[in-house]
Amino acid sequence: PGEWNIITSGYAQVDGLFHISPWLLILLCPALTMRLIAEERQTGTWDLLRTLPISLSRVVLCKYAAAWTLTAIALLPCSVHYFLVYYIAEPIGNVDGGAFAGSMVGLLFLSATFTSIGLLASSFTKSQIVSFILGAISCFALYWITLQDHYLSMARGVLDLRDVLLFVSITILSLSLSIFVLDRIDKK
């Protein structure tokens, strides 16, 4: 029993899932990204990777794309929840589809941002544990300070350009900082 229990509340909604999901992403994204660069630097394979004729930005962007794709795939079961609620509702289909679509788009933007922050944290250190802790704390702080309001706006079904620009700009900034940090490390 609880406020998000569909059966006992008598109200078919998907809000509960989308209020909990960002908090799970705060832990999932740093966990997925903690090994991307930190482990390669620790084991020495980073030096081997840097001798290949591949630019640093391509390496970082490909690692980011792989981690974000995995995170996006992890979000697919959320659609199962929507269809279950869709068929439980009285009458069938009495669910706010716009809020669901906005929430999914918001989660994709949030996961993109958290993945880039996790990759940046992995760039700073050779330790996977330190990378995870740094990434999780950074994601939590950023979500608590500013991203929560923008995500909740999207979760209501309102897709505002300012929200999208914030997520995209933080993602680009984090990826650029990752490239900058790794370039400085390579030059040492």
Language model features with spans:
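Long, hydrophobic alpha-helical segments
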Residues: 16-39
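Helix-loop-helix units of permease transmembrane domains in multi-pass membrane transporters
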Residues: 36-66
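Hydrophobic/aromatic residues in alpha-helical transmembrane segments
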Residues: 29-33, 45, 81, 116-117, ...
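Transmembrane helix-loop junction
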Residues: 39, 51, 83-87, 123, ...
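Terminal transmembrane helical anchor/hairpin motif
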Residues: 1-12, 124, 131-188
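Hydrophobic alpha-helical transmembrane segments
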Residues: 17, 46-55, 77-83, 127-129, ...
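Transmembrane alpha-helix boundary signature
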Residues: 1-5, 33, 40, 80-83
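Secretory targeting signals
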Residues: 11-18, 24, 62-129
